[in-house]
């Protein structure tokens, strides 16, 4: 990067939050945003040394390879834990556009409504379930369609598993026979029992915050208001 860069806002880290923040600040075309990311672009490029790492980001079955790839992962470790005999543990964090949303398992799982209400009771105003639900809905493009808990038209695509493996289906059926109820929506009003995960994927590929929110993915005039380094 050479020369002087002028920006109204500087965001350090183009991860799960950074991409969203850059997109929101640039929506009206009023502000120029500088988005800084220590890792590189998440998309495959002509750079062969980086091509495979970036390709695996977007292929769902390839996510496990990113968990040990220093090109897209900071490979942090925890402090020695007495509870596990003094061992340290790998703590994956994304080092790429999209951050950890570019290397996670793509599972779309909301917290229990009671947990959010508990935070509000402890004094966290604005964090009750009824306060956060509109933002869950605003962010979401639920392929099943909209309802009280879900919405369509948002940047984060949420889909059902494309390949219903028979062993997984047999496990859910076994749970049902054992008295563990089967339910239809992992993020529905009742979250006790066994069901299929939903995933942040679109057309069989990962939908990270870089894919969903980063303005450089957009053809709108606002995309020119965000500079990514």
Regions found by a protein language model. Give the residues of each.
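N-terminal redox-cofactor-binding region of secreted/periplasmic oxidoreductases
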Residues: 1-229
């Amino acid at each position: 990067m050479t020369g002087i860069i002028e920006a109204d806002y500087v965001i350090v880290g183009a991860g799960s939050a950074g991409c969203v923040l850059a997109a929101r600040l640039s929506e009206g075309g009023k502000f120029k945003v500088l988005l800084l990311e220590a890792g590189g672009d998440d998309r495959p490029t002509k750079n062969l040394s980086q091509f495979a790492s970036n390709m695996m980001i977007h292929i769902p079955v390839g996510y496990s390879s990113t968990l040990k790839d220093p090109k897209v992962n900071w490979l942090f470790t925890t402090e020695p834990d007495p509870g596990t005999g003094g061992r340290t543990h790998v703590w994956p964090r994304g080092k790429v556009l999209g951050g950890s949303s570019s290397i996670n398992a793509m599972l779309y799982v909301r917290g229990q409504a009671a947990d959010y209400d508990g935070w509000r009771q402890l004094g966290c105003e604005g964090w009750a379930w009824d306060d956060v639900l509109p933002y869950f809905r605003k962010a979401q493009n639920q392929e099943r369609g909209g309802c009280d808990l879900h919405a369509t038209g948002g940047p984060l695509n949420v889909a059902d598993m494309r390949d219903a493996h028979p062993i997984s289906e047999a496990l859910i059926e076994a749970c049902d026979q054992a008295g563990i109820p089967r339910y239809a929506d992992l993020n529905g009003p009742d979250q006790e029992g066994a069901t299929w995960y939903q995933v942040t994927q679109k057309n069989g590929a990962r939908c990270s915050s870089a894919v969903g929110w980063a303005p450089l993915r957009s053809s709108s005039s606002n995309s020119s208001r965000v500079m990514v380094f």
